[in-house]
Amino acid sequence: WDDDVDIAMSRKDFEKLKQYQNEFPQYMFLDTIQQKGHQWTAAHVVDTRYKLEVGKGMKKATMSVWVDILIIDGVPNPGTFKYKIFSAAYLTARLLYKFSNFSNEVDLEKDRSAIETFFISFARITHIEKVINQHWAGCFIDWISRRYDLDKCEYGATLGSPQKMGETQPKYWFGKGKELLFEDIIVNGMEETENFLTKFYGPNYMTPPPLDKRNQHNVRLVEKIV
């Protein structure tokens, strides 16, 4: 289904990670949506020893290897008025952020819904990214994402994921985590894996989709410095 492993953590744990980033090796750093030049809705831990050519968006770019850090924030209960208002606010903020970095961030080769195709065409025609400050847009989406404390909510979501509000799920699904085998390493996954996989991939989630339907990053290793 995918070609990498993402790391999800609560907002509180992410704030702790930020406190300890000075203890990272010299070749690693934490890149967040609030920082100038950041290009994604997820935070990244970056390893500068490796360089990749990324064929995403209107421009090809060379960048260091990264791991996505997906922050779990609280959200209102689905179906409520608060959820609808929050969803509209978050999706508006996310759209502004995408517009602000359209040439580098938006994957033009990905299958899109009709509304997403419309906004992409709008951005290409109007060059709206020239009038939206990327740093402001990043701080705005971060401010919206923090509105609900996960500890006080029944539901949580990794809002920085591609599924956006579709990532909403009962908080108890995350639980305290359990060990899972991924290739040749052990990772700490959520407790309710069955519910999660069924929601996002359907009841036949053990059957991988065709190659052209899998989430692939379209990258090529161009430099290795060790």
Question: Each PLM stretch: what is its role?
Answer:
Residues 79-84:
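A short secondary-structure junction signal
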